[in-house]
Amino acid sequence: MPLLDSFTVDHTRMNAPAVRVAKHMSTPKGDAITVFDLRFCTPNKEILSERGIHTLEHLFAGFMRDHLNSSNVEIIDISPMGCRTGFYMSLIGEPTEHQVAVAWLAAMEDVLKVVEQSEIPELNEYQCGTYEMHSLEQAQEIARNIIAAGVSVNRNDDLKLSDEILGKL
C-alpha cells in the first residue's frame, strides 16, 4: 500500500494549534488545490471530545467559508481527522498559512457567538448521521482554547520523517 503524505511527517514534533500545508496538487485543467492540516491538538497528547468535534464540524465549515472564500479561494471540504486532533481542509486556490490562521481564529470567534444548540446548522435526523451527539458547550471550550493559544504554522520540512526512520516503521 502506498505511504500517504500525512504519514511522512513526524507527529511527535507537531505544534498545536497550527496550520500546515499538507498537499498541493492541480486539476487536469490547471486549478490549484491545496489541502491544509488544521491541527487543534498535540498528537498523542490531547484529543478533541467527540461531541465537541462533531459540533465544530457543523459550525466550522460554514464559518471558515465566510472568512476565507474569495474570488480566488473556494473551500471544497472541511472534515475532522479520525484521530480527533484536528481537521483537514481542501480548497481550490493557494491561500497562505497566515490567511488560513486569521480565518481560523475568526471562525472560532464566530463559534463563541452561537447562543443556543438549536442554532447549529443541519442539527436534525435528516441531515446528520448522529444528530444527538453534539455539544455547543464543548465546541465553545475548544474555540476558547484555540483563541487563547493562537495559531502557529507547522512546516513540512521541519516535520519530515527521515528515510531511515520510515524504513524502520
Swiss-Prot record:
Which metal ions or organic cofactors does this protein require, according to UniProt? Fe cation
Task: Summarize where Fe cation binds, as residue positions.
Answer: 54, 58, 128
Keyword Iron tagged: yes
Cofactor info, note text = Binds 1 Fe cation per subunit.
GO terms in the biological process aspect are:
quorum sensing
Fetch the InterPro entries from UniProt. LuxS_sf (IPR037005), Metalloenz_LuxS/M16 (IPR011249), S-ribosylhomocysteinase (IPR003815)
Q: What is its EC number?
A: 4.4.1.21
Q: Which UniProt keywords apply?
A: Autoinducer synthesis, Iron, Lyase, Metal-binding, Quorum sensing
* Top-rank taxon: Bacteria
Say yes or no: keyword Lyase present. Answer: yes
Gene Ontology molecular function, alphabetical: iron ion binding; S-ribosylhomocysteine lyase activity
- Chemical reaction(s) catalysed: S-(5-deoxy-D-ribos-5-yl)-L-homocysteine = (S)-4,5-dihydroxypentane-2,3-dione + L-homocysteine
Q: What does this protein do?
A: Involved in the synthesis of autoinducer 2 (AI-2) which is secreted by bacteria and is used to communicate both the cell density and the metabolic potential of the environment. The regulation of gene expression in response to changes in cell density is called quorum sensing. Catalyzes the transformation of S-ribosylhomocysteine (RHC) to homocysteine (HC) and 4,5-dihydroxy-2,3-pentadione (DPD).
Q: How does it assemble?
A: Homodimer.
Tell me which HAMAP family the record gives.
LuxS
Q: Which family does it belong to?
A: Belongs to the LuxS family.
Q: What is this protein called?
A: S-ribosylhomocysteine lyase
Q: What is the lineage of its organism?
A: Bacteria, Pseudomonadati, Pseudomonadota, Gammaproteobacteria, Alteromonadales
